[in-house]
A protein has these predicted regions:
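Extended, charge-rich alpha-helical interface modules
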Residues: 1-129
Length: 129
């Protein structure tokens, strides 16, 4: 599973924050290796089948998201590594941004609530960014 959330990272519990920070890089890594296809790509954000494929051409969104996740992890005092791929293609059609719709945010928040750990942790930020 590769989760890409849409809500601000500050809203995520520690478990979801760290998991997304770790999993998000799977998409740019696949693109860097040429192991992706835009065929059958959904036109709208979705969960489940097609979730990852939706983001294959949204590297700008993923980069911004990863930077926000990384900053939030550091602000909470987590020791995390920065693993954004430096070998991504420069094709403009792969570097699209994405502005989540209200419906996409609603779907994402519902999924986060559904998957909230029984003992969710919310470490307070140790520094303002």
């Amino acid at each position: 599973m590769t989760r890409i959330n849409l809500v601000p990272p500050a809203e995520l519990c520690d478990q979801h924050l760290l998991a997304e920070h770790r999993e998000l890089t799977r998409i740019p890594n696949a693109v860097a290796k040429g192991k992706f296809s835009l065929k059958g790509q959904p036109s709208d954000y979705k969960l489940g089948e097609g979730h990852v494929r939706f983001f294959f051409n949204k590297l700008m969104f993923l980069k911004k998201r990863y930077d926000l996740l990384h900053e939030e992890c550091l602000a909470r005092g987590f020791q995390v590594q920065y693993f954004w791929s430096t070998e991504l293609p420069e094709q403009a059609d792969l570097w699209l941004d994405y502005q989540p719709t209200e419906n996409a945010l609603k779907l994402n928040r519902e999924r986060i609530t559904l998957r909230m750990p029984a003992k969710a942790r919310f470490t307070p930020r140790k520094e303002a960014i």
